Amino acid sequence: MSETKRIARDQLNRYFDTFSRKFLMPDSPGAADVEVVGSEVGAQPVANRVRLLGVDYDPHTNALELELGSGDHRAYNPREVWAVEESDGFVSSIQIVRDDGAKELVNISRGSGAR
């Protein structure tokens, strides 16, 4: 059973480091879809079925970084970060609410199909 959790800013680095180490191994076949949604931009796909190599938070730049097989993507100034966590700790979805009100949606699958 999954659980939706709000991740406190002071826990972001540790939370996503633990997730990345446990589930995003070099041979992991998992894939991510990334989309930015905002009133000024509408819904804009950033990545589709791209291999997710890691998730990291940098407190100095205040950015949550997605390390993707196609290149890195950063969500700056996250006001809120939510994660859908499966019973084994796998994060299947991340929602980042930025200071400007836009949202970054990341859906992560364990299966094959990543590019």
Model-based region annotation:
Residues 25, 39-40, 56:
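An extracellular/secretory-lumen and virion-surface interaction module
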Residues 49-93:
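Amphipathic protein-protein interaction modules
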Residues 41-51:
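Short coil-to-beta-strand transition motifs
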Residues 78-115:
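Helix-rich interaction surfaces within compact, conserved domain-sized segments
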Residues 4, 38, 58-63, 98:
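Short beta-rich binding modules
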Residues 36-42, 68-70, 96-100:
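Short acidic, glycine-rich loop/turn motifs
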Residues 2-36:
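Eukaryotic proteins' extreme N-terminal regulatory segments
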